[in-house]
Amino acid sequence: MIVMSLTNEQIIEAIASKSVSEIVELISAMEEKFGVSAAAVAAAAPAAGAAAAEEKTEFDVVLKAAGANKVAVIKAVRGATGLGLKEAKDLVESAPANLKEGVSKEEAESLKKELEAAGAEVEIK
């Protein structure tokens, strides 16, 4: 029996020339031969890399301070959160306080602009 040694490049070229169904058969045969699952390796590899490169999609809007015009800030907080007058007043007076959590970047930016226009100091986390 003559054993020919193939380079990695030759193996890759041979696989590249196969159809999708042939590659699926090859993967199944390799899983059976070596007692492994390609799905487990494929799913675990991107998850590790994706976690580091993942962009933040949910933001918290934090009222840092009410500023000089507390009445305008209370009105803006009521409009943005739907709270009643007393709840909005209590929230503004307890600054720093979370106004909204888990909102989109666009909504957070819009809320920040609205509250800053009323005189509040706002932070997006």
From Swiss-Prot:
InterPro entries the UniProt entry points to: Ribosomal_bL12, Ribosomal_bL12_C, Ribosomal_bL12_C/ClpS-like, Ribosomal_bL12_oligo, Ribosomal_bL12_oligo_N_sf
One Pfam family here: Ribosomal_L12_N
Gene Ontology CC terms: cytosolic large ribosomal subunit
Molecular function per GO: mRNA binding; structural constituent of ribosome
Keyword set, alphabetical order: Ribonucleoprotein, Ribosomal protein
Top-rank taxon, per record: Bacteria
GO biological process, any: translation
Subunit structure: Homodimer. Part of the ribosomal stalk of the 50S ribosomal subunit. Forms a multimeric L10(L12)X complex, where L10 forms an elongated spine to which 2 to 4 L12 dimers bind in a sequential fashion. Binds GTP-bound translation factors.
Function: Forms part of the ribosomal stalk which helps the ribosome interact with GTP-bound translation factors. Is thus essential for accurate translation.
Similarity annotation: Belongs to the bacterial ribosomal protein bL12 family.
Protein name: Large ribosomal subunit protein bL12
Phylogenetic lineage: Bacteria, Pseudomonadati, Pseudomonadota, Gammaproteobacteria, Pasteurellales
